[in-house]
């Protein structure tokens, strides 16, 4: 019998995993099935870009974190993209400070979670173990070492900028990645944005983005 609960197929940039959440009891049931399916070709997925297409409304923030951790740690996925199968349309931001912006004048410490529907500007560091969620852009006037998700409603036009960019995990819109495990640490501000289906990090040139 053909299993249509999870379908994995190749695309031009990597692999698609089409998941029908309605066919699973809950998130744990789906995750177990996905891991079983991916385990059959574990070495094949190493270093690839995986796009997960499903009904995103059935997965909460903690479950997204668990799913991404499994894909990055267990299967060594390079990049992970989430696409809503219901194809909701989102309005993009066109500038780094467009829309509502909240300023946080302190360091965000491990265990702290900050959420804001607009842009976030943090006048301090974002420590490892902390979490930042913004509907728009995230600007860190310090070191970024925690988890950050800009454009949480699928806004791929959002950006993340920091004086020192070394996040545990970085997500813009529906595209997620991790910082490279090397010793190269640029001594200048950087900005992360989505290009195609990949997050790219470039030197931050204020006149270009503001």
From Swiss-Prot:
Interacts with MinD and FtsZ. The keyword Cell division applies. This is Probable septum site-determining protein MinC. SUPFAM superfamilies: Cell-division inhibitor MinC, C-terminal domain. One of its GO terms (biological process) is regulation of cell septum assembly. Keywords: Cell cycle, Cell division, Septation. The keyword Chaperone does not apply. Cell division inhibitor that blocks the formation of polar Z ring septums. Rapidly oscillates between the poles of the cell to destabilize FtsZ filaments that have formed before they mature into polar Z rings. Prevents FtsZ polymerization. Belongs to the MinC family. It comes from the Bacteria. Pfam families: MinC_C (PF03775), MinC_N_1 (PF22642).
């Amino acid at each position: 019998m053909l299993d249509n609960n999870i379908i994995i197929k190749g695309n031009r940039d990597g692999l698609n995993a089409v998941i029908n959440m309605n066919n699973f009891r809950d998130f744990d049931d789906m995750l177990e099935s996905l891991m079983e399916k991916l385990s059959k070709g574990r070495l094949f997925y190493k270093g690839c870009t995986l796009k997960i297409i499903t009904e995103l409304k059935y997965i909460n923030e903690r479950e997204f974190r668990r799913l991404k951790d499994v894909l990055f740690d267990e299967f060594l996925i390079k990049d992970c993209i989430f696409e809503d199968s219901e194809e909701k349309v989102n309005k993009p931001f066109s500038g780094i400070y467009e829309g509502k912006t909240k300023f946080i004048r302190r360091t965000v410490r491990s265990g702290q979670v900050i959420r804001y529907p607009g842009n976030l500007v943090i006048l301090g560091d974002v420590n490892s173990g902390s979490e930042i969620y913004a509907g728009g852009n995230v600007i860190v006037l310090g070191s970024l070492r925690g988890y950050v998700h800009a454009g949480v409603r699928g806004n791929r036009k959002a950006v993340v900028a920091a004086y020192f960019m070394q996040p545990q995990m970085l997500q813009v819109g529906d595209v997620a990645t991790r910082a490279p495990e090397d010793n190269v640490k640029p001594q200048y501000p950087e900005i992360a944005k989505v290009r195609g289906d990949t997050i790219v990090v470039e030197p931050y040139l204020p006149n270009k983005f503001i």
